[in-house]
Design a protein with these regions (language model features):
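Conserved, well-structured core segments that form or line functional sites
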Residues: 1-128, 134-137, 142-229
Length: 229
């Protein structure tokens, strides 16, 4: 079931996204895979927030933030890492929720393979693994093998997706999905409630200098996959 709360302000939508799932379909080395992850950490942004990409109005870069709710806004951070936001609020008002961390549920070893490939800097998963119906040109498995030689210690499970760039690398989210409708493959957002006993924490956002004290970061407390703030 697609979340019906995304027409709300980002500060309403961001905590409600916690527990929702992202399902990504890819083809890697000729085999189709389904990657499923549960959102455990988000940050809220909108056009009235000086820390937001939407601040100052629409542009070629941030146009998706002003588009329909339930679509994807993807950008590159520090020239290296893709980050993704779920667009919210009615079309015309720039708003979105950064997906800051997810908990892997299905396809964990494929996510690990993609993340390990990225660690050696050659196979940037978001560019080199195609969507469903297309094959992988990057041989990410070979790159992962190289990564294993370079690093003695493989990635710990909790480190696979505990940051916005890691999320996009593990789920193969890049600019090809800019503006993507999250009701459709190859990346689908589904509503799911919090598990019994789970509670939501709130804090300032991570790594920003403007409006830095605003409590716009939301996370599932005690979840091992929440990023280190």
């Amino acid at each position: 079931m697609f979340p019906d709360f995304l027409e709300n302000p980002s500060d309403v939508a961001a905590p409600l996204l916690l527990g929702c799932t992202l399902t990504r379909t890819i083809t890697l080395n000729g085999e189709k895979h389904k990657l499923v992850a549960r959102i455990v950490e988000t940050e809220a942004y909108d056009q009235d927030d000086p820390a937001s990409h939407a601040f100052g109005g629409p542009s070629d870069r941030n146009a998706a933030m002003f588009g329909p709710a339930g679509h994807l806004y993807v950008y590159v951070s520090y020239g290296m890492h893709h980050c993704c936001n779920v667009v919210c609020e009615p079309e015309g008002f720039g708003s979105g929720c950064l997906v800051r961390a997810v908990e892997p549920l299905e396809g964990v070893e494929v996510m690990r393979e993609l993340r390990e490939a990225g660690r050696v800097g050659k196979a940037k998963a978001g560019h080199e693994v195609a969507s469903a119906g297309h094959d992988c040109e990057a041989q990410a498995g070979h790159e992962a093998e190289q990564a294993g030689r370079v690093r003695k210690h493989p990635l710990k499970l909790r480190d696979l997706t505990n940051g916005p760039g890691k999320v996009c690398a593990a789920l193969v989210i890049d600019k090809e999905l800019y503006g993507h409708d999250l009701t459709a493959e190859p990346l689908v957002l589904d509503y799911a409630p919090l598990l019994p006993g789970e509670t939501i924490g709130r804090s300032p956002r991570v790594g920003i200098s403007k409006n830095a004290d605003a409590l716009k970061r939301y996370f599932i407390e005690e979840n091992a996959f929440v990023s280190r703030a």
